[in-house]
């Protein structure tokens, strides 16, 4: 078993290193701060990838925590549903597991001009323009937010992120930061991220997130009904209704204030 694990890690590490080296070389001519930013992204991504454990091997381990076993098996069912019913092939994603031993995988920094409600966007290769800047370290995120506030007078917000998609660049693992979510939330998230791998329009974060959320939430209801897990659907639907109501309130407030 040890030799199998070593071989798996060796193959995956070489694959990941080739891609990460490409990304680093892509930004080698960038400024120091930009290079530092992408450097922490590459380092954080590599740390996650090297910690991956194959789900199939974990499920064969008799000492595996029963709760984790149930959640991993559930995600396999969700993947099968996404592939057969929605045509969203995982392409190797969510077939490995990583225990991060922290609450969030990333921390996003959102910034806006003082008294404005439109976020400052940053444009990046591959992802396009998005209204946030991600860090694998909470301290780095807070430091960047502080600098933006002190040096540019921007309003800032730092929020933890439980999951993200590498948009097909890497085979995204299941993370401990979301493994304990409820049935519908978990199904919505997995399908949401799989859709990002299939459809991502550079520079249109609102469309990308809106589409993935709609498909993920709708498919989660269908999956739970098909697998006899629909007893909590009403709770899930109610939480989505409350979120839509809040968003509508914000839109109306912006119109009223003419901002």
Located regions from the model:
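Acidic/His-rich structured neighborhood in mature extracellular/periplasmic domains
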Residues: 78-243
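Bacterial Sec signal peptide processing site at the extreme N-terminus
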Residues: 31-53
């Amino acid at each position: 078993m040890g030799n199998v694990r070593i071989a798996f890690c060796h193959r995956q590490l070489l694959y990941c290193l080739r891609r990460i080296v490409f990304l680093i070389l892509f930004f080698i001519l960038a400024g120091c701060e930009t290079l530092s930013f992408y450097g922490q992204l590459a380092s954080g991504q590599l740390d996650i990838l090297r910690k991956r454990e194959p789900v199939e091997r974990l499920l064969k381990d008799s000492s595996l925590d029963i709760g984790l076993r149930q959640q991993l098996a559930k995600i396999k069912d969700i993947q099968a549903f996404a592939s057969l019913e929605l045509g969203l092939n995982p392409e190797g994603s969510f077939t490995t597991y990583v225990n991060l031993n922290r609450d969030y995988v990333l921390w996003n920094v959102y910034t806006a001009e003082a008294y404005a409600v439109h976020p400052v966007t940053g444009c990046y290769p591959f992802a396009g323009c998005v209204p946030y800047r991600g860090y694998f370290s909470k301290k780095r995120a807070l430091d960047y937010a502080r600098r933006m506030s002190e040096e540019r007078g921007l309003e800032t917000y730092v929020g933890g992120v439980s999951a993200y998609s590498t948009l097909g660049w890497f085979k995204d693992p299941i993370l401990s930061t979301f493994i304990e979510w409820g049935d519908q939330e978990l199904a919505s998230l997995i399908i949401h991220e799989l859709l990002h791998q299939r459809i991502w329009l550079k520079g249109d974060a609102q469309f990308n997130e809106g589409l993935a959320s709609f498909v993920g939430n709708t498919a989660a209801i269908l999956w739970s009904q098909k697998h006899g897990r629909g007893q909590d659907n009403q709770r899930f639907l109610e939480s989505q209704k409350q979120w839509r109501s809040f968003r509508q309130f914000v839109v109306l407030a912006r119109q009223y204030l003419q901002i």
